[in-house]
């Protein structure tokens, strides 16, 4: 019984480590996925990419996703956008 509880707790910890919050990445352009006050489209796009919840971050005009894998998120360090849309 202790082993089962240990395995469940370990699995939950691993799942938590592999997810992150951030702007969704448009893999074709390397840019953030843009939006204009459309939470529904950002939420569905986030869920398609295995995230929990997504919304349109108004000031950045980009979809923000919570709980998505890091491979689906835009990162400043690996930014390849250069103004392309």
UniProtKB/Swiss-Prot annotation:
Please give the chief subcellular localization of this protein.
secreted
Q: Does the keyword Protease apply?
A: no
Any one GO molecular function term: sodium channel inhibitor activity
Q: Which domain of life is it from?
A: Eukaryota
Q: Which GO terms describe its biological process?
A: defense response
Q: Does the keyword Endoplasmic reticulum apply?
A: no
> Which residue pairs form cystines in this protein?
31-81, 35-56, 42-63, 46-65
Leader sequence residues: 1-19
Query: Which family, according to the similarity comment?
Result: Belongs to the long (4 C-C) scorpion toxin superfamily. Sodium channel inhibitor family.
Record protein name field: Beta-mammal/insect toxin Lqhb1
Protein species of origin: Leiurus hebraeus
What lineage does UniProt assign to this protein's organism?
Eukaryota, Metazoa, Ecdysozoa, Arthropoda, Chelicerata
